[in-house]
């Protein structure tokens, strides 16, 4: 319903200023409602419909759908913008929302008795307070991703990003299955640094195909390991809270990166890539020398 407002927005008899603020309100509502739906699915329903021994695997799979959608959603959006007008693109988005409602209604969720007392405000299943250091570094990495994505208007780039995500899924099961905990985040950050460096200095056509694969590979394995770190940092009955914290870091970072690219850096690609590079270098140093030792001494699982 919120997205459908944009369908009529450009035909309303209102001034450009009111139209701008209406767009801001729609974006705010869309983010809040999408966040509510996704947090409920990831932190409650996915967990409640899984056996206790399979809940980490269920969280792992559901989080990957969120990462892969970064490439698939952007690619579909670019296709729609090339072959359809703006209003038709909005209709496609509404149709996808209806499909989501259909699939959620098809799932069978177990009945749970309500609690005797429900507080008005609570951080339960919202934010894992002991996971703030992980939240901050993950948000910085996804901010780098948001910065890079903001410069892309190429369908091919997102196709190669999807390939990079697939490679990271395979590598987690084959290469990193018995590797040291530190290896995945470090490898992911190094891959991100290499791709950002190539964005800044290389003009070769073949590099344009390597960069999105390498960048998505790095973001994928880093985010996956941090999602598992948050689970292991949580205490009893805080698994859902850890997933909400992960989701909040992922979406906050992406949105902040895109806002920074257009609102502060004015879309200048060189400046955007330099900021993304600086953020990634900072995360690499902070994780290697500060966060990993802290995590090893504070994890609960």
What function would you assign to each model-found segment?
Residues 16-37, 206-223:
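Hydrophobic core of transmembrane alpha-helices in multi-pass small-molecule transporters
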Residues 26-64:
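Cytoplasmic helix-loop-helix junction between adjacent transmembrane helices
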Residues 36-50, 220-235:
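Intracellular juxtamembrane helix-capping segments at the cytosolic ends
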Residues 54-78, 247-259:
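Glycine-rich segments within core transmembrane alpha-helices of 12-TM secondary carriers
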Residues 87-106, 271-294:
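Symmetry-related core transmembrane helices of the 12-TM Major Facilitator Superfamily/SLC fold
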Residues 156-184, 188-192:
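Transmembrane alpha-helices of Major Facilitator/SLC transporters
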Residues 182-226:
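C-terminal transmembrane helical hairpin of 12-TM major facilitator-type secondary transporters
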Residues 234-269:
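A late C-terminal transmembrane helix in Major Facilitator Superfamily
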């Amino acid at each position: 319903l919120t997205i459908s407002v944009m369908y009529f927005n450009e035909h309303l008899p209102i001034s450009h200023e009111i139209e701008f603020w209406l767009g801001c309100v729609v974006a705010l509502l869309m983010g809040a409602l999408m966040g509510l739906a996704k947090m409920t699915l990831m932190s409650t329903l996915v967990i409640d419909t899984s056996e206790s021994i399979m809940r980490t695997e269920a969280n792992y799979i559901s989080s990957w759908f969120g990462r892969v959608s970064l490439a698939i959603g952007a690619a579909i959006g670019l296709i729609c913008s090339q072959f359809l007008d703006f209003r038709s693109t909005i209709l496609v988005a509404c149709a996808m929302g209806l499909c989501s409602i259909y699939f959620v209604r098809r799932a069978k969720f177990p009945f749970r008795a309500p609690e005797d007392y429900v507080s008005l405000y609570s951080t339960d299943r919202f934010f894992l307070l002991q996971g703030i250091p992980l939240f901050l570094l993950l948000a910085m990495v996804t901010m780098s991703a948001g910065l890079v994505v903001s410069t892309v208007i190429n369908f091919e780039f997102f196709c190669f990003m999807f390939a990079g995500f697939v490679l990271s899924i395979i590598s987690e099961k084959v290469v990193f299955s018995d590797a040291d905990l530190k290896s995945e985040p470090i490898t992911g950050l190094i891959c991100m640094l290499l791709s950002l460096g190539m964005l800044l200095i290389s003009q070769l056509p073949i590099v344009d195909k390597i960069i999105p694969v390498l960048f998505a590979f790095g973001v994928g394995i880093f985010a996956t390991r941090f999602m598992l770190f948050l689970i292991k940092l949580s205490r009893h009955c805080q698994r859902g809270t850890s997933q909400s914290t992960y989701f909040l870091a992922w979406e906050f970072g992406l949105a902040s990166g895109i806002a920074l690219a257009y609102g502060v850096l004015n879309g200048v690609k060189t400046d955007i890539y330099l900021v993304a590079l600086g953020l990634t270098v900072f995360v690499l140093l902070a994780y290697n020398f500060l966060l990993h030792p802290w995590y090893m001494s504070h994890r609960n699982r």
